[in-house]
Amino acid sequence: MHAPAGAGLAVQVAEFAWRVKNLVRPRGWARLGLPCQLMGAGMAFGWRDLALIDLANGHLVEDVKLGLDLCQQGKPPVFCPEAVVSSLFPASQQGLGSQRTRWEHGHLSLMLADAPRRALAAVTQRNGSLLAMTLDLLVPPLALLVLSLLGLNLVAWLAYLLFGLAAPAWIALCALALLGLAVALAWARFCRELIPFSVLLYAPFYAARKVPLYLRFLIKRQVEWVRSKRDEG
């Protein structure tokens, strides 16, 4: 997905995160000979494979669930970089908001409710592909990952100041530094022509703006699939 012309910094950061999730990470898994998550478009299936699973689930991220179901049946999705489907992020704030809520509440719901069961199935079936897809599912959305590591650093360094516990503080700082390095490398290799590096400096503020979205997940999460408001014309 691409940011429409004249889009603000938040949408540009979202475009970067989208490319990392749907191009960079799947290419990495493919280089390791492992499957990828399904992405909602540009997918091809065999009728016999679809007959193995229940399609009538109505999940917010039904594409991701479909990929996990197929993998558990011994049909792991294979990444095909030549299959490209392009679209634009909604230009309206209402459309953007509903789209983000559906994606992120759906991802988090599936991660919390489904990941333990998938991990157990991967171990009992000795299904390495399913284990890899489950580990990939456990990676939270980029904004939430940034917020989590910032919060972890705050707590860890506070513990260091109060109790002298240095190891947790340095581990938390190293994790945050590794995330920053990974983001910088992803931008340099795959997104340099997409956005200037200066836009990435807005990422912490972009993450902070999504705090209400994550609070709503805890208080009143979205469970029904709602189509995003599209732009007219």
State where each predicted segment sits.
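Membrane-embedded multi-pass helical conduit in multi-pass membrane proteins
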Residues: D136-K220
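Active-site donor/metal-binding and catalytic loop motifs
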Residues: A3, P81-L96
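Long helical/loop segments within the catalytic core of UDP-sugar-dependent glycosyltransferases
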Residues: M1-G58, T101, L108, L112
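Active-site-adjacent helix/loop segment of glycosyltransferases
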Residues: G97-A156
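Short, hydrophobic alpha-helical packing/hinge segments within bilobed ligand-binding/sensory domains
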Residues: L66-G67, L96
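Catalytic donor-sugar/metal-binding loop of nucleotide-sugar-dependent glycosyltransferases
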Residues: G33, G58, G67-S86
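Membrane-proximal soluble regions of multi-pass membrane proteins
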Residues: Q99-R118, P196-E232
